Amino acid sequence: MAEYTPKERLYRALRKQQVDRMPAVCFTQTATVEQMEACGAYWPEAHSDAEKMATLAEAAHTVVGFEAVRVPFDITAEAEFFGCGIKAGDLKQQPSVIKPSVKNLEDLEKLKNYNLKEGRIAVVLEAVKILSEKYGKELPIIGSMIGPFSLAQHINGDAWFGNLFTGEEVVPALLDFCSDFNVAYAKAMVENGADTIAIIDPTASYELIGGEFYEKYALPYQKKIVDAMKELDVATVLHICGNTTNGLGIMDKTGVNGISVDQKVDIKTATGSVKNAIIVGNLDPVAVLWNGTPEEIAEASKKALDAGVGLLTVGCGTVSMTPTVNLQKMIECAKSHTY
């Protein structure tokens, strides 16, 4: 069988086409302190400086060995773009949302004339362009964004779930607004060189909202992004935290190429629950990859591979203190696997 470039290999693997071996990639947060020290680009500055963001993203490939580059490193850029208060984080901690920006439809109306060439959204788009110009012919360029359900929750704050359960009119309005933004943002990423879009939608977890609410308030809005990317022949991967086992069949209806699952999900059960997507994951980022030994990582990797995982990788965002050697052991296991 012919050998493929990493870009070709991931393109084919995400579309269930034959490849020479498993790609070694990560669709969730990739940065670690060891990478920061190696490349000289550090959090929190790398969240808001395109050159530093690209440099740190590049380190996941040049220092660790992932066969792709991915930006950004957090899921707050979108909320900040729409006026939410943000705690900046530090060398080890990602930024977090501390203040919402929308209480009602009037507040939402004020956000509608946005410009993707402003704020941290513009920074991420510029980082995508930098990475694409350097690596786009050889490596997958993964553009990541928060999903519409979780973005709506960030923007609406603590009131979100109450509004959801009481059927307030701000809920569908916010979801329409957020998903339309997601589509525009994803298209801009693709224009700047991204070939794969990761949708990170943690609060749309089956554990939190159940199947009925997921089908009504998450599925159609996630699918809007996926459909737009399919028109551009751009692959999508959806990550939702928690034990999503009972919701995987519904998540598969989004049409994504890959469903990323965390360590709570049984891989064998997961692969039997979906018909269209491949299952991505699901090494425990804390117990295994951060605190485990290379031998324990090899054992956990073998278990996931034997269970039929489509792409072996981190089960959620990489912990910033994860040792490089541990990530490299997982990468070694992925690259040694043939389908």
From Swiss-Prot:
Listed cofactors: Zn(2+)
Record SUPFAM superfamilies: UROD/MetE-like
InterPro entries: Methanogen_methyltrans (IPR052024), Methylcob_mtaseMtbA (IPR048096), Mtase_MtaA_CmuA (IPR006360), UROD/MetE-like_sf (IPR038071), Uroporphyrinogen_deCOase (IPR000257)
GO molecular function: [methyl-Co(III) methylamine-specific corrinoid protein]:coenzyme M methyltransferase activity; dimethylamine methyltransferase activity; metal ion binding; uroporphyrinogen decarboxylase activity
Family annotation (Pfam families): URO-D
GO annotation terms (biological process): methane biosynthetic process from dimethylamine; methylation; one-carbon metabolic process; porphyrin-containing compound biosynthetic process
UniProt-recorded name of the protein: Methylcobamide:CoM methyltransferase MtbA
Lineage start: Archaea, Methanobacteriati, Methanobacteriota, Stenosarchaea group, Methanomicrobia
Gene: mtbA
